[in-house]
């Protein structure tokens, strides 16, 4: 008799996705991050749900309600810091997941890749709006600065900003709608993640060699379920350590000061995971140019399949491309550092050079290196 997991309409989907899924036998731990991102998403939705039970999205009480959660709600401090640091863990996994895709040529699955880029945008939007909710100084001024960027759009910019604000400044209407969007977006992210998986399972996973693995597949369970559980345990250990030992390590002290429209903080900066994009934005003196560079810094990922000039899919056997890839990683770390620094010499010029290098590497140097490697191999 056939097992129920292979016949039942719902169980069949789970079976084909997580149990009997044919998986390449040689995928490394870099392939763990998909499942880790799923765990992060579930964790964020659950902790967020419990926070929403106690949070009030009103300018007069938002800051106090977060304080109330931390002081008076049973394990409220734990839920709050799991949610805040869970976002950091989410982005660490996201960046590593995207980096893996770039290194091993996973972007050649175009539908999967493009939905992944949309997911990145959606998660970034969710995180930005979530950062506004505690209504501290950095929440308020971050919201003011970032929403104001839309005023750079010619003709409709100013009207668009006021429409998003729901008034002439960031106020009660803004906070309420940001809470509404912050609540709904994770469910949209979940749906997109489902579509992401759907397209991935149409082609099957890529593998480190970049070659077809049709001749050597193994079932996902038990081999990769146990491997994913190990990855999950390591991630949960790291997150728990962060939450229980130094929960404010990645936060901004200014956010413990209630929002005050009359007092601008000396250095307005977003959370650490947006600093690279913020540095690119600031490196261009023109407002519209900066906004376009900011958007294109993420959107450029969608061009990766078109910029792939190598005859090999993966970078595993391409040393020149490997060097450029790690230069790109170093450049992104430099941009992250610069994004958190004040706008003064020498940080301005370092940021401008790092921004130029970022786009030059992706659009010119990496495709050129791939062509050079093809010639060296006489392909």
Curated annotation (Swiss-Prot):
Q: Which Pfam families did the record assign?
A: Cytochrom_B_C (PF00032), Cytochrome_B (PF00033)
| UniProt cross-references to InterPro entries, sorted A to Z | Cyt_b/b6_C, Cyt_b/b6_C_sf, Cyt_b/b6_N, Cytb/b6-like_sf, Cytochrome_b, Cytochrome_b_C_euk/bac, Cytochrome_b_N_euk/bac, Di-haem_cyt_TM
Q: What is its main location?
A: mitochondrion
Membrane topology per the record? Answer: Multi-pass membrane protein
Q: One GO cellular component from the entry?
A: mitochondrial inner membrane
Which cofactors is this protein said to need? Answer: heme b
Q: Where are the transmembrane segments?
A: 33-53, 77-98, 113-133, 178-198, 226-246, 288-308, 320-340, 347-367
> Could you say which residues bind heme b b562 here?
83, 182
Q: Which GO terms describe its molecular function?
A: metal ion binding; ubiquinol-cytochrome-c reductase activity
What compartments host this protein?
A: Mitochondrion inner membrane
Q: Name one GO biological process term.
A: mitochondrial electron transport, ubiquinol to cytochrome c
- State the remark under miscellaneous: Heme 1 (or BL or b562) is low-potential and absorbs at about 562 nm, and heme 2 (or BH or b566) is high-potential and absorbs at about 566 nm.
Q: Which family does it belong to?
A: Belongs to the cytochrome b family.
Q: What is this protein called?
A: Cytochrome b
